[in-house]
Amino acid sequence: MTPAPRLKPGSLVVLEGLDRSGKSTQRNRLSKLGWAEPDPVFTHMPSGLTSLTRSIYHLTEEAEIQSPLARQLLHLTCHAENMPAITDARQCRAVVLDRWWWSTVVYGWYAGHLLDAGVPEVVFRSMIDVVWSNQPANVVFLFLTPFEHDELNRDEVHRRYNDLAAEHSGITVTVPPGNEDATTAFIVDQLRARDLLSG
């Protein structure tokens, strides 16, 4: 009998990249692999693990928000509110995140027009660091092939993801184009290769 797969406790696995590129699909597929106990925590940022952050995220998706800075501060509020839950989970389990702080930089700063709102990049990045500096990732799977058009997936967004990948090359794995089965198999193989998955 094949043992159930087990993600290394304490590890943080990130699914990052362009909108509509398959991240949430892969999060859902990975969550159904029949993990050994304690099974990993699977979640999405910024909706996260609490009722408060799910409510805030719903607000940012549905409400008409005039200020780009206000939208990003609401997202960062969700991130900060989820830190205790993520920290607790990593004490004995792995965590798989659908979006990390890279999305906040790329879609918040570069696509969110925060410079036009008078927010220096160094200030915005410092706010992100305050929230995320104690949650380093073991691996970031970067999705750069959207399966359908999204107006936010501009060339600048693609470039900035590539910049972050180069800046963090030691932990970044670019996901090749492929169907859902092939992509799941690729992620599993990469987790094994990095000694993050056994069984």
Residue ranges and their predicted role:
Residues 15:
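Hydrophobic anchor at the beta1->P-loop junction of P-loop NTPases
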Residues 32-41:
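Post-Walker A helix-loop "phosphate-sensing" segment adjacent to the P-loop in P-loop NTPases
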Residues 2-7, 31, 147-199:
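NTP-dependent small-molecule kinase module
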Residues 41-118, 122-123:
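ATP-dependent small-molecule kinase phosphotransfer cores
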Residues 104-163, 176-177:
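A glycine- and Lys/Arg-enriched "phosphate-lid" helix/loop adjacent to the NTP-binding pocket
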Residues 24:
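Walker A/P-loop
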Residues 20-21:
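ATP-binding Walker
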